[in-house]
């Protein structure tokens, strides 16, 4: 009986202790921040993986699969290369005088005229591509003593033999081929591009039958340059039934300069000039289809959005494009440090502040208050601190994009086989640039993430310190982001603390009085735990004693018999 009385006393003593919200003369106010059940891991300067409530992917890793035809003017080369369209290959006649922002060459493109080579193919291709036009002006060259408009069965235009429409094949007239000397001044205010060529017969007999002389010569010059080409007579691999070749050359004549052409044979003469323009047109090899859509950035894989600062779709781009990096993902923190809320808050449902964990379910703000008082519990967001954090984070993505997006195109680099060492060097330089940009991108994102997390933590601390300064000695910091308020604080009082109109002096006397009364009888939480554990142990011990006594009594009365066999 004495034991039962003692246990009852202990139980009543435990239940009689003050817990947050149980006493009408006190209240608990906690400050906290938004949290989500599953956050996003980002990298910072000091931490390789830190969880935040929200993050934005910065690397565009996929394309639309098609090249958008807006806002850039796309010219689909179909089965023509740009050089074939430039020369006037019969199957490319549809490209005459075309213009473009981006000329798209296809892998299925082919030549269907006299076999030729361009010693400086990459330079000519790049020059014409950047000009963005095939606008051609015929000029009245006078070729005296020779036959013009030569053709070949390898270059049919319809059923008849033909030739490149922008070139004029000259050969002997009768049995003579006189020395040609023609001049053409540039009296306009723009650069003119002249395309010309030299014919290389496959045999000496072909040479004399076309040009009379056993060896011809072609010299093309301006005030700034001169090119002299001697034909190389000899058989080459057969292409479209021919073992002879044409070498294509080009000359730019500046305003006020003069084009001079001198030849005694083998000349493939120009018919006029291409009007050169300056701009940011380009060329790209791609088999992606042309689609009706809008995109500022184009890659060989297709168009990509440029709303991210980085991309790893393709190194070759045209337009305002994200910077190419090696990383598949770089996440920019756009939310605060995430500390998911603990689902269990103990037997008495105590609330906790930001130092212990975040709060899930705060949909109207990033920072806020929770309270327990005589009127129950409640939660409200602090819009001012929330807006302060959002204002500083907003625009962060745009600032990163402004730092990284290229407002120009990254063209393809091409070199002939004899320029192999230059090509290797160029590849090394490009790879080094990509490595540097990839490192810079990762560092930039890590710095921004560190700043975001420090910023959001700072706003939380500012709000906590602001609340502490209001309450002063009327409340006690509980160490977990909460304050125990030592006076009756109804919902209106809590609201005044939140909006900064709390009057400390009004509650000062009541708070001091309650603090001294409560402190005088308050048991520390450690003693409460010990009392609970001791009372539980004693109860278990008494239960065992009663059960053992009952068994012994039953055995003595004969109601229970125990046999032990050996």
Curated annotation (Swiss-Prot):
Matching entries from Gene3D superfamilies are given as:
3.90.20.10, 3.90.209.20
- GO CC annotation terms, alphabetical: host cell plasma membrane; membrane; viral envelope; virion membrane
Q: Which SUPFAM superfamilies does this chain map to?
A: Influenza hemagglutinin (stalk), Viral protein domain
* Membrane spanning stretches: 531-551
From the Swiss-Prot or TrEMBL record, state where the protein is found. Virion membrane; Host apical cell membrane
One biological process GO term for this chain? viral budding from plasma membrane
**Signal peptide as annotated in the record:** 1-16
Q: Where is this site: Cleavage?
A: 345-346
Sorted UniProt keywords: Clathrin- and caveolin-independent endocytosis of virus by host, Clathrin-mediated endocytosis of virus by host, Disulfide bond, Fusion of virus membrane with host endosomal membrane, Fusion of virus membrane with host membrane, Glycoprotein, Hemagglutinin, Host cell membrane, Host membrane, Host-virus interaction, Lipoprotein, Membrane, Palmitate, Signal, Transmembrane, Transmembrane helix, Viral attachment to host cell, Viral envelope protein, Viral penetration into host cytoplasm, Virion, Virus endocytosis by host, Virus entry into host cell
Q: Which InterPro entries match?
A: Capsid_hemagglutn, Hemagglutn_HA1_a/b_dom_sf, Hemagglutn_influenz_A, Hemagglutn_influenz_A/B
* Entry keyword annotation includes Thylakoid: no
Query: Where does the record say carbohydrate is attached?
Result: 24, 38, 54, 97, 181, 301, 499
Cysteine pairings via disulfide bonds: 30-482, 68-293, 80-92, 113-155, 297-321, 489-493
Cite the post-translational modification comment: Palmitoylated.
Lipid modification (S-palmitoyl cysteine), residues: 555, 562, 565
Q: Which membrane topology term applies here?
A: Single-pass type I membrane protein
Q: What is its main location?
A: virion
GO MF assignments: host cell surface receptor binding
Q: Does the keyword Transmembrane apply?
A: yes
Topological domain (Extracellular) residues are: 17-530
Q: Subunit arrangement?
A: Homotrimer of disulfide-linked HA1-HA2.
Q: Which family does it belong to?
A: Belongs to the influenza viruses hemagglutinin family.
Q: State its role.
A: Binds to sialic acid-containing receptors on the cell surface, bringing about the attachment of the virus particle to the cell. This attachment induces virion internalization of about two third of the virus particles through clathrin-dependent endocytosis and about one third through a clathrin- and caveolin-independent pathway. Plays a major role in the determination of host range restriction and virulence. Class I viral fusion protein.
Extra information:
Major glycoprotein, comprises over 80% of the envelope proteins present in virus particle.
HAMAP family found in the cross-reference section: INFV_HEMA (MF_04072)
Question: What protein am I looking at?
Answer: Hemagglutinin
Gene it is expressed from:
HA
């Amino acid at each position: 009986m004495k034991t039962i009385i003692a246990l009852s006393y202990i139980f009543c003593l435990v239940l009689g202790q003050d817990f947050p919200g149980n006493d009408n003369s006190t209240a608990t106010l906690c400050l906290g921040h938004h949290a989500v059940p599953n956050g996003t891991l980002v990298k910072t300067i000091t931490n390789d993986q830190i969880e935040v409530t929200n993050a934005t992917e910065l690397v565009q890793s996929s394309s639309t699969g098609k090249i958008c035809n807006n806002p850039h003017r796309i010219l689909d080369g179909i089965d023509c290369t740009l050089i074939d369209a430039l020369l006037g290959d019969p199957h490319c006649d549809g490209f005459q005088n075309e213009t473009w922002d981006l000329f798209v060459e296809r892998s299925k493109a082919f030549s269907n005229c006299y076999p030729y080579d361009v010693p400086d193919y990459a330079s000519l291709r790049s020059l014409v591509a950047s000009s963005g036009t095939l606008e051609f002006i015929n000029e009245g060259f006078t070729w005296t003593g020779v036959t013009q408009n030569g053709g070949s069965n390898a270059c049919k235009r319809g059923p008849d033999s033909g030739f490149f429409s922008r070139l004029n094949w000259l050969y002997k007239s009768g049995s003579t081929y006189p020395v040609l000397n023609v001049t053409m001044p540039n009296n306009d205010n723009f650069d003119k591009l002249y395309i010309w060529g030299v014919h290389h017969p496959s045999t000496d007999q072909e040479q004399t039958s076309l040009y009379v002389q056993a060896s011809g010569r072609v010299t093309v010059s301006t005030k700034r340059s001169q090119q002299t080409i001697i034909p190389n007579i000899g058989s080459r691999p057969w292409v479209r039934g021919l073992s002879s070749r044409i070498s294509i050359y080009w000359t730019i004549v500046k305003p006020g300069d003069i084009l001079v052409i001198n030849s005694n044979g083998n000349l493939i003469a120009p018919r006029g000039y291409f009007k050169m323009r300056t701009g940011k047109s380009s060329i790209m090899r791609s088999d992606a289809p042309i689609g009706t859509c809008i995109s500022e950035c184009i890659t060989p894989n297709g168009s990509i959005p440029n709303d991210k600062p980085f991309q790893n779709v393709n190194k070759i781009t045209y337009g305002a494009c994200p910077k190419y990096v090696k990383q598949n993902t770089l996440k920019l923190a756009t939310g605060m440090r995430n500390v998911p809320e603990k689902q269990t808050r103990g037997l008495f449902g105590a609330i906790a502040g930001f130092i212990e964990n975040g709060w899930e379910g705060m949909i109207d703000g990033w920072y806020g208050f929770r309270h327990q008082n005589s009127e129950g519990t409640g939660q409200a967001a602090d819009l001012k601190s929330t807006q302060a954090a959002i204002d500083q984070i907003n625009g962060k993505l745009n600032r990163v994009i402004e730092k990284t997006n290229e407002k120009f195109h990254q063209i393809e680099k091409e070199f002939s086989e004899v320029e192999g060492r230059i090509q290797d060097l160029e590849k090394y330089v490009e790879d080094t640039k990509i490595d540097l940009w990839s490192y810079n991108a990762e560092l930039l994102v890590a710095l921004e993430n560190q700043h975001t997390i420090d910023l959001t933590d700072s706003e939380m601390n500012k709000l906590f310190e602001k609340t502490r300064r209001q309450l002063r000695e009327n409340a006690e910091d509980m160490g977990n982001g909460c304050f125990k308020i030592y006076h009756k604080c109804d919902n209106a009082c809590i609201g005044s603390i939140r909006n900064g109109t709390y009057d400390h002096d009004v509650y000062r006397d009541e708070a001091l009085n309650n603090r001294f009364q409560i402190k005088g009888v308050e048991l520390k939480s450690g003693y409460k735990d010990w009392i609970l554990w001791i009372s539980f142990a004693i109860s278990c011990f008494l239960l065992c004693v009663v059960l053992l006594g009952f068994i012994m009594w039953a055995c003595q009365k004969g109601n229970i018999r125990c046999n032990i066999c050996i």
